[in-house]
């Protein structure tokens, strides 16, 4: 009976019934095989014992004898008998006829009623094996031995006594398992174009030529291996022919590299003798167990890189141990211990194998402990490493060591009596000295509040002027603006103490202020220090602070007699500012502000007379003048002694005349002239 699909030319081909072997579940295949000597013949016979309407085909080649084909079929019939009876899940292809396991090819062309060959690969790439299955073919066999997930496949060349280790890798050239091949499928029809990936050790087409010799083409050689593996990594494969080497470079596709230097996981090649007596099910079970063991071993993914052989990995090229996918180990107790995940296409090296192949020492990442503790790397544990690690500790020790050496009594004296915690006036509320405030803002406030490497603010300042000019108030407001602790010490009180006690107190003050930065120390009446030893100690402290730009420490000294300061001590001040008495506008502002609660009843002429008479008064003395005038106004009102007045009356000009008799300025004209002359020479 002639099949309507079989061409007439195929019926003339030679066919020997000895090579016919019925298959239970393989669909109809029509092959047109070209041969140099003779043409193969195909003949289909309906296998009536099967109820599913399957066909059995016999195929023969004139290149081998019938006896050789019978021996080969007998040898592999027992091996594949159990696999052929297993059910095969056919893919749904709509209205097409039922295809075989891999589809059919007719003379290299797909018939219009047959679907395209399907594989088990989900990425749509070409299969590792040809999309057809041939029956009763002798010669070497190419059988996949991979039991890994889709995308990873192993190929082994099988013959009578040959075994080859399958090279595996993350590839889309994944063919079906050995259970899905016909009993005597020959690798002759396996073209190199079916496998675009370099991960499979698939020999070229010339390796699969039909030979009566049962060995695997001893004449096959190549000069350029597909992978640039080191010679020490892969042992000699005794099962292969002596002249057989890896496939040539043309099997590598252009978009992919030949082989990365770093390969994933601690994978090893397993030499499996597929051509032996071990069944394919055992091979698949072994490969599956090896895959599970590799997945369970987290440490194999975090080893040093080397040229370890590859092994079947997961279906994803990037293996992340952590389920969250963020690269951090979930079982780590170290909150800062980062364990990077390496891709499965890379391999790692055991700790004892470090430097075995590369000859270099491994780079050990620095260990970070909890609470910010830092441990230097192994390369920094020498002198440099210890210095870098102890920099912050040494700096803290420098700050804390002076505090430990301070006498507790002196420390308590500085903390309780010398530290001034009284509220300071706002910088904008300071009356008078507008030019001095502007100079301090430019020289000190802006460089401190907005640091600039090119601008260094002054660390030692001298404020000189008559008594009551507001030098202390200005210094206190300045410390409040820069957010520094304020310490105040009178040099007149310091000079009255014993020499040893005065020096110890001065040293304690500077030590505490240095340890509690930012800080400001105000030394008033600095001209009172006449003792040589105490003056030299103060001079040494000022020079130390002046040349150390990293400290947030400011020293302000005030004096009303700058002419009495020694020149050696005077040179220790970076800036010198003259704080004079308030002028007419400042005095007017102070008087009106002080009289605002009761109201000012003075006329403009009377107010001008009061301002003219108050020349030489300081701000503090002007406030005393206003208070005395208010008291005089309250006393002149006829109010009973024990009764409260309805409202306080505003002072009159007569009240101010009475106040001038009781409040007098403390600065002398000689003192004012001295400060003015000294300011012209030494003031900045």
Swiss-Prot record:
Region (Disordered): 27-48, 99-179, 292-403
Keywords: ATP-binding, Cytoplasm, Hydrolase, Nucleotide-binding
Positions of ATP binding: 431
Required co-factors: Mg(2+)
Entry GO MF terms: ATP binding; ATP hydrolysis activity; microtubule severing ATPase activity
Comp. bias regions, Low complexity: 160-179
UniProt superkingdom: Eukaryota
Protein name: Fidgetin-like protein 2
Gene symbol of the encoding locus: fignl2
